Amino acid sequence: MSTKPKLAVFKFASCDGCQLTLLDAEDELLDIAGALDIACFLEASSRVVPGPYDVALVEGSITTPHDAERIREVRRQSKYLVAIGACATAGGIQALRNWADSQEFLAAVYARPDYIETLATSTALADHVTVDFELRGCPINRGQLVEVIAALVAGRRPRTPNHGVCLDCKRRGTVCISVARGVPCLGPVTQSGCGAICPAYDRGCYGCHGPAPQANVASLAEHWVRSGAGPAQLVPLLRNFNGFTPEFRRVSDELAARLAATE
Amino acid sequence: MPDLLLQKGDLQLLFDRLSGDGFRLVGPTVSQEAIVYDEIASVGDLPRGWTDVQAPGSYRLEPRSDEAFFGYVVGPHSWKKYLFPPLATLLTADRTDSGWAMHAPPEPTEKYAFIGVRACELAAIKVQDRVFLEGAYVDPIYKARRDRCFIVAVNCTQAAATCFCTSMNTGPRCQAGFDLALTELSAAFIVEAGSDSGRQVCGQLPLREATPAERAAAEAARAQAVAGISKRLETEGIRDLLLTNLEHPRWADVAARCLSCANCTMVCPTCFCSSVGEVTDLKGDHVERQRQWDSCFNVDFSRMNGGVVRNDVRSRYRQWLTHKLASWIDQFGQSGCVGCGRCITWCPVAIDLTEEVAALREPGP
Ligand code: SF4
Ligand code: SF4
């Protein structure tokens, strides 16, 4: 019997992009396959070895009663559970439903809404089970995923920095697009992990890796409002892949209330 | 040596001379809607006809009405990115049958000529020299680059709204620490040599002695920069002011605005903090020890066994400002601030350290 750690990959409500990152780790894939027994990874192979597993990488958010049951089973079967991606760590873009009436959506989309069983919200795995490690991002970063796997194989803590995106812009010499062009950018309050890609391509940060620790989102939003950006622009910026995290949610709710008051 | 005159059309000859001596030219150039420092090939890469308009939290690149080569102030980059690189490999190690084989990275071979260094930046390089070269430990990465660089300074002939070098006694006139210093006039540069290598280069350029009228014109151009400075930092008793007001209510006030995003420390030409970590391959057979720019504004920067020491924005902003303006004096015998104004311009929420200090001078309510 193999003594290599048994790895399983599971998917909930998600786009598959984060699991694809594992397949995308082409340079490391052979080493990963050598170091781990990939016991369940449906995107790569139909071979499924039953649990328990040493490590589970779990993608996706919890959006149905069935999901809520299944994540508990995954937890029971897994020694070390890693939530991967914004869906699994924050509810994902589909958490936009949390501000709307999901029954209304069902009625608009499906001919027979009564066939569909869904929860009113899309929520993070940690809202349902204990999560051992959260790897953020929409999608996750390949280098960070390899780091997490390398750390698990070596039996050490993964090293995924939690500082803001600005540090990465500065290290790579990107000129701040917020200061030099007045573009609202979530970089100062967003956790690093992407390598600060968007500002290097003239776009403000979308907050893909979620709020940085102790993020002062309210001050950043106030500054934009003073500089002339209205809540109508700022609310959608904050309600994105990580919009339902408490830090982003609190401020987008405040701005939305202000917007409603002026309408 | 008397002041000399270099016709603008001959500026390229200076660049050719330096390239011919094996220097890689680094200087101002327009990129990403700003005037940045990057490798340049010829005078054609200089930001001729461009300027910067700066205010707290705001920088705009704008065209000038003339063709000045150096008609701007300081931008988002500083020379520290060449002397103290943002990412450096300190050592690599490979697992072998007989244990770990360690390798020091190769010595850098490139030598830089910095074109357009301002007085506050000369002062900032001096501050970092003190940190990296003059203490008990000499940083070999900084030293290798610093020993070999050639500095062409440029005297400012205008100031930004964020400049306060006059408060810090660092400018705007370049006094020392350069090989050559230029003052830009409309058709020529007045050239001063500040070192033997500078004088040697002068000897190989078609220069003539400046006339009294040309020297007066240079003096007048430099006076415009002094006249343009409106910002002031009162430094009288600043060390004691900061260190005896650690519980002043202003710290909580600034913490409510500060994002702890670290931009101020990254753009500051004197901030020198870094963190060192090991990066391994998946098998753990190859390890690189890397040093990266880091900042006292990052939560994990003060993480020690047992937890984070400065676990809120208030304590981190206070750490930065008191170090920069007060305990730096105890540590290095001078202020850590040269008055370049970068931290004011590049703060995404327009926090201005001179205003914070002024508020700390007022008794709390
Ligand atoms: S003072 Fe400004 S630039 Fe510095 S950490 Fe605070 S918000 Fe960021
Ligand atoms: S503290 Fe600010 S003004 Fe002073 S040297 Fe640093 S960036 Fe320039």
Question: Which residues does each predicted region cover?
Answer:
Chain B
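Iron-sulfur-associated redox domains of electron-transfer enzymes in respiratory
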Residues: 1-243, 249-251, 271, 282
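Single, functionally critical "micro-switch" positions that shape active/binding sites
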Residues: 21, 261, 340
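Residue-level detector of anion-binding/catalytic polar loops
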Residues: 24, 264, 343
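A generic structural-conservation signal
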Residues: 27, 267-268, 346
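Ferredoxin-type iron-sulfur electron-transfer modules in oxidoreductases and energy-metabolism complexes
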Residues: 235-256, 274-365
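Extended amphipathic alpha-helical segments enriched in small hydrophobics
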Residues: 255-265
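A donor-sugar binding/catalytic signature common to diverse glycosyltransferases
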Residues: 263-279
